[in-house]
Amino acid sequence: DTKILRFSYSSMTTPREIYDYDMDTRMRILRKRQEIPSGHDASRYVTRRIFARSHDGEDIPVSLLYAKDTPLDGSAPLLLQGYGAYGHAGPASFSAHRFSLVDRGFVYAIAHIRGGTDKGWRWYENGKLEHKPNTFADFISAARHLCQEKFTREGRIVALGGSAGGMLMGAVANQAPELFAGIIADVPFVDVLNTMLDEQLPLTPPEWVEWGNPGADEKAFKTILSYSPYDNVRAQKYPAILVEAGLTEPRVTYWEPAKWVARLRELMSGGGPIILYTNMDAGHGGAAGRFDALKDIARE
């Protein structure tokens, strides 16, 4: 038995802090605070939570970070990040890397779309299997709402997502390319239908609970076909897209991003460029070394 509860806290403007809370005296004691070697003045920044209305009336939480002197008249560039899969909730926590962009006038936004558990288990259930298209609609709705509220404007948004979030990037590139100046897709799962049909791939059967089994279920086949990024590339103008792959990647094999890039380059009617970067020594998580990982972030 103990009367002390230890917890941690951070926000998009506050580095991680660890506290002890005495449940008898109701006193809170700061035990440790994350040090930022380059320095950090939280008073220079604003973090907010707003909500965007999706196609079916659901309110999509969007977390924002920007400098206090950023003009909110639609002129600011905006980086919009999303994932929306496997029940993973995207925490609006502190990351020192973001401030390089924010200090240069960017608004940084995280769309807490369906497929995660940001609003509970129902939020996850309504973004998987036959409900997967909600994930993409939510992200597009968040982007449009940010334009309507003058945090940015169409053509000033860069979208960012990796793995299943890379699938999100591919889907929104097909469905609403006019919204984005650029898209960054890290190890993107973009050939969804072919991968889910190939049960010889060791990671395919465990994934059927998330996406459906198109080889055994016609409804799952049609749903996946409706959004699979590779299968829905068409002759239209695309934003600039940076695609990153890893040669030793066991989850999203390197040829998936490569064939997607080839299809985009073949069919697109304008826009781009479409750039493929393959790390010859990296897997699903990107570069392993601390400094190499920082180079990955800087490249993006």
What is each of the regions a protein language model found here?
Residues 70-120, 192, 253-254:
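Short substrate-entry loop that stabilizes the transition state in hydrolases
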Residues 46, 58, 76, 153-155, ...:
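Exposed loop/turn and edge beta-strand positions of beta-sandwich/beta-sheet ligand-binding modules
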Residues 110-300:
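Active-site-proximal cap/loop segments of hydrolase catalytic domains
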Residues 18, 52, 62, 80, ...:
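Conserved hydrophobic/aromatic pocket- or pore-lining residues that grip, position, or stack substrates
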Residues 8, 65, 81-82, 160, ...:
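Short hydrophobic segments within beta-strands
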Residues 31, 50-52, 82, 111, ...:
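Hydrophobic residues at beta-strand termini and immediately following loops
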Residues 1-74, 88, 96-99, 103-104, ...:
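Non-catalytic accessory segments flanking enzyme active sites
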Residues 10, 23, 84, 162, ...:
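Flexible loop residues that form catalytic
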